[in-house]
Amino acid sequence: MAGDVEGGGCRVSWGALLTLLLLPLPSLCTLASGKEPHVIKLYEGKVVRYNESKNFCYQRTYEPKWSDVWTKIQIRVNSTKMIRVTQVENEEKLKEMETFNMFDLFSSFLKEKLNDTFIYVDLYSNKTCIKVHVIDTDTYYSVALSRGFDPRLCFLFLCGLLLFFYGDALSRSQLFFYSTGITIGMLASMLILVFMLSKLMPKKSPFVALLLGGWSVSIYIIQLVFKNLQAICSEYWQYLLGYLGIVGFVSFAFCYKYGPLENDRSINILTWTLQLIGLLLMYISVQIQHIAVTMVVIAFCTKQIEYPVQWIYILYRKIKRKRAKPSPPRLLTEEEYRKQGEIETRKALEELRGYCSSPDFATWKMISRIQSPKRFADFVEGSSHLTPNEVSVHEHEYGLGGSFLEDELFGEDSDIEVEMDIEQPLYLVPRSCF
């Protein structure tokens, strides 16, 4: 019983101690909430310098125009030592920060401390406030507000256009596949390592909680690396090159093992993903919201109109081709006809010799059917397919001064067209040779 009483007394004492510790908090919150925070107004082009913790606010004084599509407004806080900068929406949030809050107190210790901070302000934000907390008393800092053209926004917009209109071609490109895989491997190597470890761990292992925390730690480290990229490149460039080389090779080997996409459905999914990313980049790169929506809609309609325009153009060409009168073919001259006949006849004779010399040709069967086997054999060996007597008869009948020409010139029915190929006896193989 005494032990229970002592245990109970111990519990009562701990509860009383906790009550005594928490009792001052409401009074502190009340005192802090009744005190209005001192706020310093920020103006474009004006630089202010202080050496103690202050609150600053910027209030929008003009409406954004169409010329501000790639305009940025940023607040730069530069200090001699490490400081902590917190961004809030208005003075009310600053007033809430002045109150005592265990969560805010804990999160303030987790906030990153920098000596050069950039805060980007939305063009449509009516008011933006920051709180600069000085850690060391001998710290001096300056706060400047600037507005101007941001080339990075323009670059993002062009990248969005490229991804949206050329997503199909990029999804089928091997160069894009390997370059994207290597880049993702370099940027997200820690995330990939955590993912691979999670596959090796059992699902009910206590390390799952550690891995879940590892994702957030990895993202935090990546943000920290990007913020200090210039210092890392100048001081630790040897380690950076080694890291990029090893991770790049591993990423390339991984991509080479699985190879580019070949399935049409996978390619379509990648194409749609690239197009959605392109539309998202186009939207976030334009600061004027209604102009951003208009550009996204125009790009989408232009991409979809591409196919109907092609169909209309093909239909127009077919209709035009049907309505157009066929142009009469150009007739050959006598010299062109003679040359074409010689070329085609020589080509046909060579094909016939090749066929007769092939193993598929039934030689004995053909010899049994022709009248002059020796003439056929001479023809296959390369001799002419016409005898001198046949050439002489052809020249006598169809040459200059021949009977055919006299009938054409002096015949009574010379105005009637006679369908006769005058060069045919010269080029065709006589039937008598087979």
Swiss-Prot record:
InterPro entries found in the cross-reference section: NEMP_fam (IPR019358)
Post-translational modification summary for this protein: Phosphorylated.
Region annotation (A) ranges: 176-287
Record region (Interaction with banf1-a and banf1-b): 326-434
Disruption phenotype: Morpholino knockdown results in defects in eye development, reduced expression of early eye marker genes rax, tbx3, six3 and pax6 and reduction of cell density at the neurula stage. Co-knockdown of nemp1a and ran elicits reduction of cell density and eye defects more significantly than the individual knockdown of either one.
Motif Nuclear localization signal in this chain: 317-325
Keywords recorded for this protein, A-Z: Developmental protein, Erythrocyte maturation, Membrane, Nucleus, Signal, Transmembrane, Transmembrane helix
Domain-related comment: The transmembrane domains are required and sufficient for its oligomerization.
Name of the molecule in the record: Nuclear envelope integral membrane protein 1a
Recorded name of the encoding gene: nemp1a
